[in-house]
Amino acid sequence: MKKIEFELHYQAQKALHACIDKANRYFQHQFPMPLLSYQLRGKAAGKAYLQLNQIRLNPILFKENKTAFLEEVIPHEVAHLLTYQLYGRVKPHGAEWQSIMQGVFLLPANTTHQFAVASVQGKTFQYRCQCREFPLTIRRHNKVLRNEASYTCQKCRQTLIFTGIQLS
């Protein structure tokens, strides 16, 4: 387990088991229990690894949004795994996934979360051209530093220059 308290992990496992139990009853089928991991970074709340039957949760967002994770994010990701196991490769938030969210879990088929992401935002760096300033992510900033990429303003077509300022 990565950076997650035992009690929170226990609650996540309980929610996961409840989702699989609901699906087993609904479809009259025995679905394998997914593996739960907390190795997701960035702004994503959760991610389903279909062929591994694994769900990865963002531990920082989970700690900040416990109830929403237990009631919405975990069922959302379980629905992806169930969709894959029942229908194979289909659109990630297509009709099959929506029917599982609404029919099995009785939840709205929301495709994105509305969590505050400031705590997982990552570093940004200020770049400028002739007409304005741009925040670049650490990934893009590092590519510029290694001469692997350069970025151009769409408006004035000038190459962006690092100002020396780290924004966050």
From Swiss-Prot:
Cofactors demanded by this protein: Zn(2+)
Protein family: Belongs to the SprT family.
GO cellular component: cytoplasm
Co-factor note (free text): Binds 1 zinc ion.
GO BP, one annotated term: response to stress
A Pfam family this chain is assigned to: Zn_ribbon_SprT
Binding site for Zn(2+): H76, H80
Keywords linked to the UniProt accession: Cytoplasm, Metal-binding, Zinc
Cystine connections: none
Record-annotated SprT-like domain positions: 17-161
GO MF annotations in UniProt: zinc ion binding
Record protein name field: Protein SprT
Domain of life: Bacteria
Signal peptide span: none
Species of origin: Vibrio vulnificus (strain YJ016)
Residues at the active site: E77
Locations listed in the record: Cytoplasm
InterPro entries from the UniProt entry: SprT-like_domain, SprT_Zn_ribbon, Uncharacterised_SprT
